[in-house]
A protein has these predicted regions:
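Select transmembrane alpha-helical segments in multipass membrane proteins
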Residues: 9-19, 45, 85-98, 131-135, ...
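Interfacial loop-to-transmembrane-helix boundary motif in multi-pass membrane proteins
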Residues: 148-156
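Membrane-interface "cap" regions at the ends of multi-pass membrane proteins
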Residues: 1-33, 37-43, 56-64, 72-73, ...
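Helix-loop-helix junctions that connect adjacent transmembrane segments
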Residues: 2-7, 42, 46, 123-127, ...
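Alpha-helical transmembrane segments of polytopic integral membrane proteins
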Residues: 29, 60-63, 109, 113, ...
Length: 244
């Protein structure tokens, strides 16, 4: 199906929810400990999250420019194809479909199951793997049936993920006790630890480019996509920094 025959049904809030929702996931849970360990000090850990988000800003600005110039489904495949690199475009599409997205989806599903298993031990082992498969199939079927329904689902699921974080942040600010800010730095922790901390944030800031893969589904993509991409990185940056 060509992009001209697509019915553009999604707006800014769907784009923002998809960008934020695909970014804020298992990354913050998996990476937070790695960032703290690599940084060695709370101040360096917080700074690492800030720098990691700042580094992501130029990336999303480039994506915003490309998505505005070529508002078609396909993301990198379209951009490389338009640049005249058709073999590289094919390799990008092939690698994304077979090598990049499936492991990412599997990791996120297994992360959900792992956290559920801490409350419900039944989901340890084969039962957990089956639950992970079921989660993937259910979410896939929702998006397959309707683009608009998929967008609405993404708004809801993103809100469900973000609200608990906001509650933790608000409660932390309300009951802040500066006596708890005393800490013992990890031996050998120096400013050079910042590099390791920033590197550990990389996984947590990936995902915003997901909306570029479906640029042909958005109404007025020239305005919606840049606003959604830039807003999403700022929201995620603020969220991660406050959680750190």
């Amino acid at each position: 199906m060509s992009n001209d025959s697509l019915t553009r049904k999604l707006g800014f809030w769907s784009a923002l929810a998809i960008a934020v929702g695909t970014t804020v996931g298992s990354g913050i849970f998996v990476s937070s400990g790695d960032v703290a360990k690599a940084a060695g000090m709370p101040s360096i850990s917080i700074l690492a999250w800030i720098i990691g988000g700042v580094i992501a800003i130029p990336q999303v600005m480039v994506l915003a420019e490309l998505a505005t110039a070529y508002p078609q489904n396909g993301s990198g495949y379209v951009y490389l194809n338009k640049a005249g690199w058709r073999p590289l475009a094919f390799l990008y599409g092939w690698a994304t479909f077979w090598a990049l997205d499936p492991p990412s989806i599997s990791i996120m599903a297994l992360a959900i199951v792992a956290y559920l298993a801490s409350f419900f031990p039944f989901f340890v082992g084969i039962a957990g793997k089956l639950l992970g498969v079921a989660i993937i199939l259910i979410i896939t079927s929702i998006h397959y049936r309707s683009v608009k329904a998929g967008g609405s689902f993404q708004v809801i699921i993103t809100a469900i993920k973000i609200i608990p974080f906001l509650i933790v942040i608000v409660l932390g600010l309300m009951y802040m006790n500066f006596d708890n800010f005393a800490y013992t730095p990890v031996a050998g922790a120096t400013s050079s630890s910042l590099i390791g901390g920033v590197s550990a944030t990389t996984w947590a800031y990936t995902g915003m480019a997901a909306i570029c893969f479906m640029a042909g589904e958005f109404k007025n993509p020239g305005k919606v996509l840049p606003r959604a991409l830039i807003s999403s990185v700022l929201i995620v940056l603020g969220l991660y920094t406050l959680l750190a």
